[in-house]
């Protein structure tokens, strides 16, 4: 007969019952691979140069689209790494406000990383509306920080100007793909 604990329902583990060896898949790891496991063009194949894309805010979800877009145009895509303390510290000098959210503060370090890589230009658009995933969704807009933080970067990361790195930061709407 099964012994049961009211709070955990795991009392039988101490009775020698075998542990389930088929753990649930790590969905975070799965998503990271689906979003970022793309092979960039080689330097020889990239006839138009290199574009840097920061792995930040809305660019996480939109990266497959932008990677494909720039690759088809003949650019080698350079993606900033996953966020770390070292990445955060790279951009600390250009953060203009203590009150902005931490994910936005991380953007500065990702931009600095891409500058250090010597890319031809950095692409970081302001995306007001994302693609509508469901007709039943009430909205598909980004928060004001996500939608406009590219302007903050343009105006506060002085290394962009000092190192003569072109910074492309158009405002786009992904809810009507034909407008891109």
What spans do the regions from the language model cover?
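An N-terminal assembly and electron-transfer interface module characteristic of large anaerobic redox
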Residues: 1-180
């Amino acid at each position: 007969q099964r012994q049961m604990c009211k709070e955990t329902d795991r009392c039988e583990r101490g009775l020698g019952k075998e542990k389930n060896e088929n753990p649930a898949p790590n969905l975070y790891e799965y998503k990271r691979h689906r979003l970022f496991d793309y092979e960039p063009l080689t330097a020889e194949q990239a006839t138009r140069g290199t574009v840097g894309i920061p792995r930040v805010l809305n660019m996480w979800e939109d990266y497959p689209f932008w990677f494909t877009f720039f690759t088809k145009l003949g650019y080698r895509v350079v993606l900033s790494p996953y966020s770390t303390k070292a990445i955060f510290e790279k951009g600390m000098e250009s953060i203009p406000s203590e009150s902005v959210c931490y994910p936005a503060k991380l953007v500065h370090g990702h931009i600095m990383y891409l500058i250090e890589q010597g890319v031809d230009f950095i692409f970081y658009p302001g995306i007001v509306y994302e693609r509508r995933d469901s007709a039943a969704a009430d909205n598909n807009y980004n928060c004001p920080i996500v939608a406009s933080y590219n302007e903050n970067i343009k105006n506060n990361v002085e290394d962009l100007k000092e190192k003569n790195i072109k910074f492309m930061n158009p405002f786009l709407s992904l809810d009507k793909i034909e407008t891109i």
